[in-house]
Amino acid sequence: MGYTETWSGKINRKLIKKLHIIDVAAGREKADLVLKNATYVNVFSGELDTEDIAVAEGLIVGLGQYEGIREVDMPGKIVCPGFIDAHIHLESSLVSPAEFARAVLPHGTTTVITDPHEITNVMGTD
């Protein structure tokens, strides 16, 4: 639908972004990015599937046939969501959270779940 700030004069940017995400997911607007012919890890079935992946405002909004402002052909490339390490003892790693992130991000771990006291212990007093 192409919502803009002039649409009502008072719609804030966050709402416009959310409306854009909805419209892209519904196929009414072009995605910001479409990864064409991408093979992705289906974390529910454990299988590799191949489809187009639509991205709007930095979020994956759909799989299937989408048009994009930017399109990248991905035959033979595998796309995988960020991994979540659901049980980590950060304190036992003997490194700061920033150093830990530098070590795990290149391997696909984007999220960790740890006890708050461990974060406090490794952050120090600074």
Model-predicted regions and their roles:
Residues 3:
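Conserved glycine-bearing catalytic or ligand-binding loops at nucleotide- and phosphate-handling centers
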